[in-house]
């Protein structure tokens, strides 16, 4: 009986130290990535390991980091128009969108709608595994609060654009621009940026190089939203250009 208690005590001790260590790593990551490029994300690691485990050794999760000054302003505008139009104003969470999503999901349980902001998506993609669970969502909330506290909005947007998944093995807007349009991210047009943003909800299902009718329709909607937001002026007014 004593040995069992001792074993449980040691398990608790090392488990607690492990949790503290992970939290410390996350905190260090938030501080470091406030200034330095993010070399890889948890999503990239997960995709790479998944490919190797299935025998796909040709798969390479690829990303080319570029600063915001080397990204077309249309791209920043497109992802905000598509994913989070209140990004400059909220502190990581869009309460109105959350309430709307909860109401929708109660009525349509077969078609679940999310309400994650760009800040939440950035925190999740950089630091957490893929999937849906209350534990992961709770960690996402804490990490989102952390990056909103430490990073500027411009920094959050820069990291997001450099780690977002745009296709199979294609991460970051620079890799996407060169792969799909044979040009650097700085040269993306409004239409090209809107097309890239249109596949973000599910880049493994929706294809930039073979867009479905839905993707084309969403691209046109994003272009209209970009115009309604005010175009490049919207970025300048919110110090995001």
UniProtKB/Swiss-Prot annotation:
GO annotation terms (biological process): cell wall organization; peptidoglycan biosynthetic process; regulation of cell shape
GO molecular function: pentosyltransferase activity; peptidoglycan glycosyltransferase activity
EC number of this enzyme: 2.4.99.28
Keywords: Cell inner membrane, Cell membrane, Cell shape, Cell wall biogenesis/degradation, Glycosyltransferase, Membrane, Peptidoglycan synthesis, Transferase, Transmembrane, Transmembrane helix
A Pfam entry, by short name: Transgly
Domain of life: Bacteria
Main location: membrane
Known catalytic reactions: [GlcNAc-(1->4)-Mur2Ac(oyl-L-Ala-gamma-D-Glu-L-Lys-D-Ala-D-Ala)](n)-di-trans,octa-cis-undecaprenyl diphosphate + beta-D-GlcNAc-(1->4)-Mur2Ac(oyl-L-Ala-gamma-D-Glu-L-Lys-D-Ala-D-Ala)-di-trans,octa-cis-undecaprenyl diphosphate = [GlcNAc-(1->4)-Mur2Ac(oyl-L-Ala-gamma-D-Glu-L-Lys-D-Ala-D-Ala)](n+1)-di-trans,octa-cis-undecaprenyl diphosphate + di-trans,octa-cis-undecaprenyl diphosphate + H(+)
Residue ranges the record marks as coiled coil: none
Membrane topology: Single-pass membrane protein
Compartment annotation: Cell inner membrane
UniProt keyword annotation of Glycosyltransferase present: yes
GO cellular component: peptidoglycan-based cell wall; plasma membrane
PANTHER family documented for this protein: BIOSYNTHETIC PEPTIDOGLYCAN TRANSGLYCOSYLASE, MONOFUNCTIONAL BIOSYNTHETIC PEPTIDOGLYCAN TRANSGLYCOSYLASE
Family per similarity comment: Belongs to the glycosyltransferase 51 family.
Role description: Peptidoglycan polymerase that catalyzes glycan chain elongation from lipid-linked precursors.
HAMAP family, per the entry: PGT_MtgA
Official protein name in the record: Biosynthetic peptidoglycan transglycosylase
Organism: Yersinia pseudotuberculosis serotype IB (strain PB1/+)
Organism taxonomic ancestry: Bacteria, Pseudomonadati, Pseudomonadota, Gammaproteobacteria, Enterobacterales
């Amino acid at each position: 009986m004593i040995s069992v208690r001792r074993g449980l005590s040691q398990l608790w001790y090392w488990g607690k130290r492990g949790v503290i260590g992970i939290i410390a790593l996350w905190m260090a990551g938030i501080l470091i990535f406030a200034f330095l490029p993010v070399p890889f994300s948890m999503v990239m690691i997960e995709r790479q390991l998944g490919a190797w485990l299935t025998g796909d050794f040709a798969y390479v999760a690829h990303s080319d980091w570029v600063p915001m000054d080397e990204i077309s302003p249309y791209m920043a505008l497109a992802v905000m128009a598509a994913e989070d139009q209140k990004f400059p104003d909220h502190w990581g969470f869009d309460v109105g969108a959350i309430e709307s999503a909860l109401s929708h999901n109660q009525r349509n349980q077969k078609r679940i709608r999310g309400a994650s902001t760009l800040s939440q998506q950035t925190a999740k993609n950089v630091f957490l595994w893929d999937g849906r669970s209350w534990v992961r969502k709770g960690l996402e909330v804490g990490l989102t609060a952390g990056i909103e506290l430490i990073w500027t909005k411009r920094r959050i947007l820069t990291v997001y654009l450099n780690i977002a998944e745009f296709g199979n093995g294609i991460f970051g807007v620079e890799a996407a621009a060169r792969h799909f349009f044979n040009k650097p991210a700085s040269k993306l047009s409004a239409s090209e940026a809107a097309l890239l943003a249109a596949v973000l909800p599910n880049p493994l299902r929706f294809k930039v190089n073979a867009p479905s009718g839905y993707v084309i329709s969403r691209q046109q909607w994003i272009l209209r939203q970009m115009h309604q937001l005010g175009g490049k002026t919207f970025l300048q007014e919110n110090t995001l250009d």
